[in-house]
């Protein structure tokens, strides 16, 4: 396991700053991957492979990267924006990292092992009916059966899940990659599909910063930024942390997300002195036993949902975040669709 983790770390560094030797070895494999991915998409679009259309409009929010684009807060913001406009929204997702493969419609008792950490976070954050399943169409059918008043479904991820037809495609693209010329497909790079794929989506949302001036793959460009909320106690979310009291305390930050440095930087930007940081693999299981000793341990919202039954210690705090998308992405989606029913 340690050797596998070390190899994965080397590959991820290579994706950010390519090593010439690795590029020489991996480039042919990326060429093969590109051909397979292109044929698969063509087969679905031509009807050679079957795809399913759900009885309500489907909006896919995904990416051409292999994770780490800041998509989950954007999905939450879009769903909330649609809800504010009176739309009854449902969410479907694969539910990466969960222990079961069965379709699961989330409820108040759902845990991360049932649904996956990101779908559970979206469900709790937005209150939108949510279902998970490796087949998005099957998850969508189950969701509509449980909540027949849903007027629109947002598919979290699944841009490459062509077995489900979609009415609107939204691709999230990290600002840090908008000026790069060395991006490549897996395994030489971290792209699932080539940059040209962005030409065919309905909109591109640039996340995490300002895009390069020459980056404009779509007529419909949006930008998102993350705003940190008020830190609250895990065992009592109504209790807000007075960060001033941390001045003489030992603070440790723990994150099991794709880009933990963003989380750690957010805390420092809030004026919090973090003595130690603990970066866990994305979607990693985490329990109270994994948390280090400290006066205060601050974790992400995504990790917080893994403590479904709470924990015995009172020194664990949660930093919530939200995405601000400009211009109005929810309004754009409704303009692309016709006659989306509003909630009664």
UniProtKB/Swiss-Prot annotation:
Sequence positions that bind ATP: 65-72
EC numbers for this chain: 2.7.1.130
Keyword Transport tagged: no
Highest taxon of the lineage: Bacteria
Catalyzed reactions per annotation: a lipid A disaccharide + ATP = a lipid IVA + ADP + H(+)
Family: Belongs to the LpxK family.
Protein's recorded name: Tetraacyldisaccharide 4'-kinase
Organism lineage: Bacteria, Pseudomonadati, Pseudomonadota, Betaproteobacteria, Neisseriales
